[in-house]
Amino acid sequence: MKKKQQHPGGGADPWPHGAPMGGAPPGLGSWKRRVPLLPFLRFSLRDYGFCMATLLVFCLGSLLYQLSGGPPRFLLDLRQYLGNSTYLDDHGPPPSKVLPFPSQVVYNRVGKCGSRTVVLLLRILSEKHGFNLVTSDIHNKTRLTKNEQMELIKNISTAEQPYLFTRHVHFLNFSRFGGDQPVYINIIRDPVNRFLSNYFFRRFGDWRGEQNHMIRTPSMRQEERYLDINECILENYPECSNPRLFYIIPYFCGQHPRCREPGEWALERAKLNVNENFLLVGILEELEDVLLLLERFLPHYFKGVLSIYKDPEHRKLGNMTVTVKKTVPSPEAVQILYQRMRYEYEFYHYVKEQFHLLKRKFGLKSHVSKPPLRPHFFIPTPLETEEPIDDEEQDDEKWLEDIYKR
């Protein structure tokens, strides 16, 4: 005689093959008996609602991230190639074996950070490689109204591709106005060195003006032109104080009013934009390595740039932009500048560290030399750039056009 099949709870199974029990309505008995067998399926309407709400928040967050200027696809692919992608980057579609080079590049050049040299190189390269170099007739307006942002983004976005747009302008969020976010590049330098170069350039110009007996700012009063740099700093003149000293960070923070206020908010936002929207931010003190990396990242724009840069004729032209009549501030004045520019230095050192990490990934060594007797920001940099001056309109591209026509 066969034993009855025992129920896991100890009793005999009163129904074969899961048939309903007794007179219970069809399906009800089955439901009551099966739920204990599958405890992991138990959930309440509250649990269900919680899960759906969580999913909705995640989807909305993802959408807002993309609409607020998430990284361009090219930068995400590049992160994966370099081995420094984030969790979210890695869970997208894998990059192709050959990276599609971007056809929209913006160089929102920081004043007095080598941009004259780079623009001269770009003019030569655009003829050589056939890309569209887009410049602007406005050289002294970095902060834009909302309407001005929309108009500029529209003009840039409708340019013939591949294009490289260059202008002294604070970071623009194309995605905010419905445009495709381009890839950004830029170069910065030691903040005190940049400030000193600008201070004396506004007053005395460079070697081009010196040779042609040109006065850089004819409307400047003589007492202002010959104002001692130490007096300007120690007596807290506006030109040597904040917010005027808070100069580099806004180029990366953006157009928000708080980006012009020295503080942690602008600093952190600038770092975030560097990570998400800039293909490369180099430092002027290592310009050759900057050009080498640009040639590797953007060969259809920068192929052969290092050879052109090292050409004696080009270097001769570039050296004409060196600022003249620089003097060295006192150690006391320098320490005050350091204190006033602490956010600028925190950003500079962050960018420098990221740049060196990138160099190591490409097998480039960062040569650390012994510290000079004087601080390094007093050592003249061979190639300077022109600064957009707020109080005087100018055409800082004309000299490039004249040189290029020779």
Curated annotation (Swiss-Prot):
Stretches that traverse the bilayer: 50-70
Record bears the keyword Glycoprotein: yes
Name used for this protein in its record: Uronyl 2-sulfotransferase
GN (gene name): UST
Residues listed as glycosylation sites in the UniProt record: N84, N140, N155, N173, N319
Region (Disordered): 387-406
Compositionally skewed regions (Acidic residues) per UniProt: 387-399
Effect upon mutating C113A: Severe reduction of catalytic activity due to disruption of binding to the substrate 3'-phosphoadenylyl sulfate
Keyword Transmembrane carried by entry: yes
Molecular function GO labels: 3'-phosphoadenosine 5'-phosphosulfate binding; chondroitin 2-sulfotransferase activity; dermatan 2-sulfotransferase activity; sulfotransferase activity
GO CC entries: Golgi membrane; membrane
